[in-house]
């Protein structure tokens, strides 16, 4: 009986994974991204998949949100900062993808984790996400907290710099969306690619 339940669970995960991957690929293909610049990782990392991701941060309401809150549903996680136009556009595209998934009766939790916790406090995240999608969960914490969770996901990012030409701060980082299973384990990651006007 237990073996049968495990097999059914794996089948459901496989189907959901295939549907989500297909929808994300098609959405990016027909949106403002060049098809040749869209990268879909087709391999699930055995190392990452062998153990659940562990972290503890604070959401936009100031409440603790940890790895246990990822369990019970699929999650899409994106790392970025509130002052980046590229990140804002990425979140809006994720929002569009979620709407498509909802039409297929696939419920996915969306999580935005800041890479600049000094600037992006819970209050800043709350105001920022209200203008994008109230369903997004925004997470922040101490510098050590963010470093730890970024390392868990192997996120590449550089220290914040000031752009004298634009008069704005920028923080360069990898542009991946991470899909987490309903038991809190890494399943897959997708790169959103580069917009046509950024080539």
Swiss-Prot record:
The record lists the membrane-crossing segments as none
- InterPro entries for the chain: SCO1/SenC, Thioredoxin-like_sf
CDD domains, sorted: SCO
State the family it belongs to: Belongs to the SCO1/2 family.
The protein depicted here goes by the name SCO2-like protein RBE_0029
Q: Which organism is it from?
A: Rickettsia bellii (strain RML369-C)
